[in-house]
A protein has these predicted regions:
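N-terminal signal peptide c-region/cleavage motif recognized by signal peptidases
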Residues: 15-17
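Sec-dependent N-terminal signal peptides
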Residues: 4-13
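Alpha-helical adaptor scaffolds
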Residues: 58-59, 63-70, 82
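Conserved anchor residues at repeat-unit boundaries in beta-strand-based tandem repeats, strongest
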Residues: 22-31, 43-54, 66-77, 89-100, ...
Length: 124
């Protein structure tokens, strides 16, 4: 059940980020380093290529979620860490905005689960 909750949460975060309108940019948000602020108060600070999140960056939501890591074409791709509001984290590989590849989920109580993830689901 927890696997499905994570998938739902990640899907909502990705959908919200993709649909929120940008309201302002500081720096070079076209081809360089900049900070975008969205109408829902989500922020992105990092590298941009052709006005897309691309390279290293940090995306933060007002509800406490924070992703730090690599982006490709505005999606989480490569190595990254997602921190949940309760302090839980996922650290590992990402592709197309989902946990894909080797990674470790650490709950706020310190319990860990390491394994191979595919489209946000732990493969057991």
């Amino acid at each position: 059940m927890k696997k499905y909750i994570f998938i739902i949460i990640l899907s909502c975060l990705i959908a919200t980020s993709a649909s929120a309108r940008k309201t302002g940019c500081e720096g070079d948000c076209e081809n360089g380093f900049g900070k975008w602020t969205y109408t829902d108060k989500t922020t992105y600070e990092g590298n941009c290529v052709d006005t897309k999140k691309h390279g290293q960056g940090t995306e933060s939501w007002p509800n406490g979620y924070i992703y730090r890591g690599e982006f490709k074409n505005s999606k989480w791709s490569g190595q990254g860490v997602l921190t949940f509001p309760d302090g839980s984290t996922y650290k590992g590989e990402w592709a197309n905005g989902f946990m894909n590849g080797k990674g470790t989920f650490t709950w706020s109580n310190g319990k860990e689960k390491t394994g191979i993830w595919k489209n946000g689901k732990l493969q057991e």
